[in-house]
């Protein structure tokens, strides 16, 4: 596998994180949260191909489907919460971080990196260094996560009061898409 092909694969695997993080960024995140989410997604995108490589097809098919469903439900919840927080009376005006605990952060990271788990199964059949591939996939996904969160944050500032509604709609849309 050429380096160009590996990079293209990494970009394709990072698009879920990028688009999801635009929606999260719109809700309002600070620099620390951007760094934490980006680093966690980066780590998951390194570990998942390695896990896929070693775990085998059976585990991946079972865990992949359950994690996709859990991830879709999380996105629907987060998106619905963001929409509700926008339209409910008496809302506060400060930025909201929609992932409020470690479990949510880990589930988010796992849900956007499930494709990397599947890719790990197939990387073993290619002429590529697994460590190099996992590193490239992780770095690209981390950078795309950072870019999505940052873009969402500034788009959110620009849109103003209804930015969270837009972010919620994006998250619900991605959550629904994961079911199909």
Curated annotation (Swiss-Prot):
This protein's record includes keyword Cell membrane: yes
Major site of localization recorded for this protein: membrane
GO cellular component, one term: plasma membrane
Compartment list: Cell membrane
Membrane-crossing residue ranges in chain numbering: 6-26, 34-54, 67-87, 103-123, 130-150, 159-179
GO MF term set: manganese ion transmembrane transporter activity
Protein role: Probably functions as a manganese efflux pump.
Family affiliation: Belongs to the MntP (TC 9.B.29) family.
Protein's name in the database: Putative manganese efflux pump MntP
Gene field: mntP
């Amino acid at each position: 596998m050429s380096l160009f092909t590996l990079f293209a694969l990494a970009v394709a695997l990072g698009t879920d994180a990028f688009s999801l993080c635009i929606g999260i960024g719109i809700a309002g995140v600070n620099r620390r949260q951007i760094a934490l989410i980006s680093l966690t997604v980066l780590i998951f995108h390194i570990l998942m191909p390695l896990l896929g490589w070693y775990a085998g097809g059976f585990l991946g098919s079972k865990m992949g489907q359950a994690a996709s469903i859990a991830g879709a439900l999380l996105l629907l919840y987060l998106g619905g919460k963001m929409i509700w927080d926008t339209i409910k009376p008496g809302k506060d005006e400060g930025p909201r971080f929609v992932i409020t605990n470690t479990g949510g952060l880990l589930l988010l990271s796992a849900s956007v990196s499930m494709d990397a788990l599947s890719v790990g199964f197939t990387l073993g059949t290619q002429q590529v260094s697994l460590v190099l591939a996992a590193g490239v996939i992780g770095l690209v996904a981390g950078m795309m996560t950072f870019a999505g969160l940052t873009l969402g944050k500034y788009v959110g500032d620009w849109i103003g009061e209804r930015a969270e509604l837009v972010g919620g709609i994006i998250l619900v849309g991605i959550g629904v898409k994961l079911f199909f």
